[in-house]
Design a protein with these regions (language model features):
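Hydrophobic transmembrane alpha-helical segments in integral membrane proteins
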Residues: 1-21
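Membrane-water interface of transmembrane alpha-helices
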Residues: 15-31, 89-103
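Cytosolic, membrane-interface loops and tails of multi-pass inner-membrane proteins
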Residues: 29-40
């Protein structure tokens, strides 16, 4: 199992990336609203929101607050850190699908939220992250 220093470093990087992207997205959407364009948060961005919250609440917080955790609580930061890494990896593919750069190049017209390929990738990513989280959390030592 990874040491607390490594887990907190990975969670901090994930959180920093997620918060930076969220500020970028909000700024962009406010500008789009001023231009009369539809305003939305792409479904793919919710992967980053979830990864950020998981990193802060299920990795950093337990590492700081629980000094002598045992059993499932001891594995919680590692499970959450692994899941948030999957969420960030899935975000990359999903946001590319949202902008039709990865899948959907033959689609025309305005983008939908979510794009069909984006929706599939987001749900697959969420399922994989949840499965990995559960596996690590419940794995016997």
């Amino acid at each position: 199992m990874a040491d607390p220093g490594t887990l907190s470093t990975v969670a901090s990087i994930t959180s920093g990336f997620g918060v930076a992207m969220l500020f970028f997205r909000i700024q962009r959407e406010l500008q789009m609203g001023k231009e009369g364009e539809p305003v939305w948060i792409p479904l793919a961005d919710w992967l980053l929101v979830c990864a950020t919250l998981v990193s802060l609440l299920l990795v950093i917080l337990p590492l700081v607050a629980l000094t002598a955790a045992a059993g499932v609580l001891r594995r919680l930061p590692a499970a959450a850190c692994s899941a948030s890494s999957v969420l960030v990896a899935g975000y990359i593919l999903s946001i590319l699908a949202h902008y039709r750069l990865l899948f959907g190049r033959k689609r025309t017209g305005p983008r939908a939220n979510p794009e069909p390929a984006e929706k599939i990738l987001v749900f697959m990513t969420g399922a994989l992250a949840l499965a990995l989280f559960t596996y690590i959390l419940l794995a016997a030592e």
